Amino acid sequence: MKFMKKLSLFIMFLVIGAFFSENSYSKEKSSNSYYEYTTEKIKIYSDENKKENIGTLIKGTRVNVYDTKEIIKKSKDKKGNEIEKKTVMKKITYKDVHKTKVVWIEDGYLVSTLNEAVDQRFKNLDFTKKEKKEYTDNKRVKVRGLYVSAHSVALKGRLDELIELAKKNNINAFIIDVKGDYGELTFPMSDEINKYTKSANKNPIIKDIEPVIKKLKDNGIYAIARIVSFKDTIYAKENPYKIIVYKYGGKAFTNSDGLVWVSAYDKNLWEYNVTVAKEAAKAGFNEIQFDYVRFPASNGGKLDKVLNYRNTDNLTKAEAIQKYLHYAKEELESYQVYISADIYGQVGSSSDDMALGQFWEAVSSEVDYVSPMMYPSHYGKGVYGLAVPDANPYKTIYQSTKDSINRNNNIDSPAIIRPWIQAFTAAWVKGHINYGPNEIKDQVKAMKDLGVDEYILWSPTNRYEKFF
């Protein structure tokens, strides 16, 4: 009898303990699910009395508020009268890469949504949670890839050489041109393409894509189709009324390379690019990578007032790019391919879209993988406090990756970060260094030290042998 009473008491304590434990856990969980966002760059402190300024948080940083205190400081004015200064301080947590940090900030700099926190031109972007699937017949792969041009694929024996090099050096993916830098289509496609272009598919350099895909898959190589989106000379020639021009005089706008750009507002080009992507998916590619998914560089947006982007829907640049990627993702979902987007390397470190339409959280929320082009040679003098970023591959990649991870921390369904890294020597950069195996290792280590284990090497000539 005594035993039964003791057993009953024991069970009761267990139930009560479980009840309180569950309630405590639920409360903790509930607290962590409510976020606020910083409205500007703000100082962070080690305690509520602001004894030590330990850094800053950028605009739009996601935080949790755990405590609020009113701090009263007494002092005297010049006449000896006692005065009080009241400051409301908030104890918050935020994620710095993968660590949760606890700091204090002044009140008055938080709002409840990211849309409220960002600048006016980004307030209509969609930062809501999106489903990111894994397909049963197309498993995700942690990519360690090489860019392989269509010419390398078509050149007799070269693809075999690159496959052997990949096997020996732990490379498991090739990024292959499907729609190239001038808008050329690289393998024969169906008549569906003819609705959008008369000449882009006339002389494809890869005569038969089927044996290429088979060879890649037989050798365990994950196949990614690179599709250049809005830099398209062929489409521009066929559709001169869709290119970006100067408002006064109608002259075609070009960057320093002399190439014209089609506006990213052109929905016919959206459809064309996605139709090409569907052809690639049907051919057996595992993933579609959209490159040049941006507006052309316009001197930081200073030229926007004199350029005609043919913006009939009155969208911002960032809205157009996000809507394009969203459209592509929806259209390609039934083909069970993953979607990735290439963006400028410094987008993760920038508080805006760099006047390109590439706003980090907007792009990352839409695609499966985001590939910032983190070539150290492409970072200007003094960026990240480095005199010559090209000569500091580890530090450049580390800081750029860190900033990118922290931008991902602001949204619920971010893309996996898979940077492009430099496999070439930038002889045009003053103070540059020669790149070889050690510089590749430095870049990979910088990412790995931050938990990023996917990357792609870019060499425009595909001469990768000297980098391993």
Features from the language model and the residues they span:
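Boundary regions of SH3-family modules and the immediately adjacent low-complexity/disordered segments
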Residues: 27-30, 80-137
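SH3/SH3-like (including bacterial SH3b) beta-barrel domains
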Residues: 46-59
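Active-site-adjacent "subsite" loops/lids of carbohydrate-active enzymes
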Residues: 135-153, 230-279
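Catalytic domains of carbohydrate-active enzymes, especially glycoside hydrolases
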Residues: 158-184, 282-287, 450-453
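Glycine-rich, aromatic-flanked loop segments that form ligand/cofactor-binding clefts
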Residues: 173-178, 205-253, 289-291
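Aromatic-lined carbohydrate-recognition surfaces of secreted/lumenal glycan-active proteins
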Residues: 224-231, 289, 317-356, 412-424
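Substrate-binding cleft of secreted/luminal carbohydrate-active enzymes
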Residues: 367-378, 393-398, 403-404, 408-468
